[in-house]
A protein has these predicted regions:
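Long amphipathic alpha-helical scaffold regions
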Residues: 239, 245-247
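Acidic/glycine-rich phosphate/pyrophosphate-binding loops and surrounding catalytic core
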Residues: 1-197, 203-210, 214, 226-227, ...
Length: 283
């Protein structure tokens, strides 16, 4: 995952732009240049992610990363997930920035991993696709964490895919009038997949006649979604079905079992943080 140096600098500036007042008060009482070691330990089972950002932050403070796991690695409560060596003063500047990156990133990758495991148990072909609702100013961290957890991005942004929502369809006098334009949309963007959101079985059935590449069923019950999958299988098996609306770890297996191809979810982005601890010791 490419993360620009300016993003790393912005992250550091948000917490350490000036001086570390607390550590500065120790000057004269302790050797702030003495070599020390920072260790980040997890208090819960997790799927690791965020290592690249942590290493870059540590390096910007002149600290050397000693232990850095592979993205997507599994850790148990009590395991060390990251360590770095540097001066006592520098490690205190890097410490919380690194720990907070891991707290958010690992929570996303862990939750995504748990969802994917539940989905695949119900339907091995079903894919988790996260929405573009990642929290602001942190897309690189969020996307990297999602991938580490086994998920994919449903959409990175407006630029990378075609998805007609009901708000787009209101530009037409009727749903049927919109559907009649699908062939033209394909001509105008021949290398792109055309996906359309529907909110009812009636709209789904009508849309099947026009052969879009994918249909996103929004806020349907598992029963309604299963009925749509059966209709698709009977008439247009090449069309992919995405399910969206309130899908999370508690219900993803049920939705995956309907036969949907992709479960679209924002749940991975709003699960809080992992429980981690940081310790700095002189060496």
């Amino acid at each position: 995952m490419f993360i620009s140096q300016s993003k790393i600098d912005d992250l550091i500036a948000s917490d350490g732009a000036f001086l570390d007042l607390t550590t500065e008060l120790l000057r004269g009482c302790a050797d702030l240049n003495a070599p020390a070691r920072l260790s980040i330990v997890t208090r819960q089972d997790l799927i690791f992610s965020g290592g690249q950002i942590a290493r870059e932050v540590a390096a910007r403070f002149g600290c050397e990363t000693q232990h850095l796991a592979r993205e997507g690695s599994a850790f148990c409560a009590g395991d060390e997930i990251f360590s770095a060596r540097g001066s006592f003063e520098s490690l205190h500047k890097a410490w919380k920035i690194v720990q907070i990156v891991f707290e958010y990133s690992c929570k996303i990758s862990t939750y995504a991993h748990e969802m994917v495991a539940l989905m695949r148990e119900a339907n091995p072909r079903c894919v988790l696709g996260a929405t573009r609702k990642s929290f602001p100013f942190a897309k690189e961290l969020c996307v990297n964490a999602l991938i580490a957890g086994g998920g994919t991005m449903h959409r990175l942004g407006l630029h990378d895919s075609v998805l007609f929502f009901s708000n787009h369809i209101r530009a037409f006098a009727s749903f049927s009038e919109f559907c009649a334009q699908i062939a033209k949309f394909k001509e105008r963007a021949p290398e792109r997949k055309i996906m359309i959101e529907v909110a009812s079985e009636r709209e789904f059935s009508e849309l099947l006649k026009y052969a879009p590449d994918a249909i996103m069923c929004d806020k349907m019950s598992p029963g309604e979604l299963r009925a749509c999958v059966l209709k698709r299988d009977e008439t247009a098996p090449q069309i992919k079905i995405c399910a969206a609306g309130g899908i999370n770890k508690n219900n993803c297996a049920e939705f995956a079992a309907t036969g949907a191809d992709v479960l679209v979810s924002s749940a991975v982005w709003n699960q809080g943080v992992c429980d981690l601890g940081g310790k700095i010791e002189f060496i």
